[in-house]
């Protein structure tokens, strides 16, 4: 199922057989038809050389496919949800740091704990990647961010023990718009920018 964000960003829902992630249950959609999550992410890059070093040495990825135009890496145990596809586009004009409506700001990767997150931060800095943030408390999780050689921003995040249930009970998740603590002062402004959802 191909569709577009109102701003023109293209998306596709694709059915696959090899996704063994457990779906959400308890909703109106049958579990076997539920979306399991993101299968892969795609990143455009002008030059593969520096990104290859970052992915393999810095981010711990494994290159599993390369046809010269598209390079696929897997992180962690690989498989659905752990795939990153890089499209090599040497003639593409460099991007801008201005993020427009509908654009993806960064890609998040879960790490197991704060120790692992700190090790990754110090490892990246030791390799010379200086654009690594300090830990940011996002209310539901703690994050660090790094600007990769491709220009894409990656996030390494550690979920808080209670995750999204830190500010609402599990049986009420998704019924109200919840705002992370650091953004609550801007809630009215943020809500005004959201489009209206029809039942």
Predicted regions and their residues:
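Glyoxalase I/VOC metalloenzyme domain signal
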Residues: 3-67, 75-131, 147-199
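Short acidic/glycine-enriched loop/turn segments that link adjacent beta-strands
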Residues: 69, 138-142
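Conserved S-adenosyl-L-methionine
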Residues: 132-136
